[in-house]
Amino acid sequence: MIEKNWQELIRPMKPEIEPGHDPARQAKIVAEPLERGFGMTLGNALRRVLLSSLQGAAVTNVHIDGVVHEFSSIDGVREDVTDIVLNIKQIALRMHGEGPKRVVLKKSGPGIVTAGDIEETADVEIVNKDLALCTLDEGAEIRMEFTINTGKGYVPSERNRPEDAPIGLIGVDALYSPVKRVSYKVENTREGQVLDYDKLTLEVETDGTVTPEDSVAFAARILQDQFQIFINFEEAVEARPAEDDKPELDFNPALLRKVDELELSVRSANCLKNDNIVYIGDLIQKSEAEMLRTPNFGRKSLNEIKEVLAQMGLHLGMEAPNWPPENIEDLAKRFEDHV
């Protein structure tokens, strides 16, 4: 059966999100277990797409009143126009709808002009409002009109200044990608008694216009869409086994549930994972004394697990005849509606 090419590969659990110092911009996304070699394959593909192919919005050109070209200076403004344009490139924004759109900034001195001084519209939202653009002296004024568009990747300033552009329109390098940095690492992890599966950790930093978790989801969707063209067959729909076809079990089907499906605290869940306790059937055979010998597992975690098991009519120290079954993963899928 051709379906075995993909159905018999191990599939990772739902990715674990580890927020960074600024959760809206930084996070680690962890996926495990993966077939050996898949960590590098998926990590490299996702990284390339994250950095090159996600849509974003950016300033494409700017007109500053009284300025003829980008090598000018402005009376009462401490920065020259070149520095102002460099700062404009760092504006992070969201655009709702199609571009291009225009927004205006007007301010009088003294004081610092920030991205938050840009007059937002229903279509344009400034994310990093604290970004400094320039500094005005007493009595100085500045007015800037920005053109904003959507795109992907990098577009140089020369392409953002039309040939028939009026004097004073300055092209800006457009950095459309909302993802600023991506790195990944692949480590060994275990599943059951197998020790050489891959664990993929993606470390993603964005400009705040999209979360790291969403950016990875968008990149995965792009890859899914691109890979789809290579599939040249239709999958046969397998009939779901009838109730009478299910094998009789020598134990409670609830034992086939994985412990990571239980609503446990992070500490308790990590302790079980580190002790290679995968299924509830593995857990109930442990005594309280054995559990307390688990590193970082204390009385609070023990009471939490006892309470969860009690709600299922189970407890620690139980016997589970014929556990674990040889085809445990297959049984877990077939009995998933009953556990």
Swiss-Prot record:
Superkingdom of this protein's organism: Bacteria
Enzyme Commission (EC) number: 2.7.7.6
Region ranges (Alpha C-terminal domain (alpha-CTD)): 251-339
Catalytic activity: RNA(n) + a ribonucleoside 5'-triphosphate = RNA(n+1) + diphosphate
Residue span of region Alpha N-terminal domain (alpha-NTD): 1-234
An annotated Gene Ontology molecular function: DNA binding
TM segment ranges: none
Gene3D superfamilies the record matches: 5' to 3' exonuclease, C-terminal subdomain, DNA-directed RNA polymerase, insert domain, RNA polymerase, RBP11-like subunit
Record flagged with keyword Nucleotidyltransferase: yes
Keyword field contains Transferase: yes
Species the sequence originates in: Maricaulis maris (strain MCS10) (Caulobacter maris)
Function: DNA-dependent RNA polymerase catalyzes the transcription of DNA into RNA using the four ribonucleoside triphosphates as substrates.
Description of how the protein assembles with itself and partners: Homodimer. The RNAP catalytic core consists of 2 alpha, 1 beta, 1 beta' and 1 omega subunit. When a sigma factor is associated with the core the holoenzyme is formed, which can initiate transcription.
Record protein name field: DNA-directed RNA polymerase subunit alpha
Protein family according to the UniProt entry: Belongs to the RNA polymerase alpha chain family.
Entry comment, domain topic: The N-terminal domain is essential for RNAP assembly and basal transcription, whereas the C-terminal domain is involved in interaction with transcriptional regulators and with upstream promoter elements.
GO terms under cellular component: cytoplasm; DNA-directed RNA polymerase complex
Keyword annotations from UniProtKB, A to Z: DNA-directed RNA polymerase, Nucleotidyltransferase, Transcription, Transferase
GO terms of biological process kind: DNA-templated transcription
HAMAP family (UniProt xref): RNApol_bact_RpoA (MF_00059)
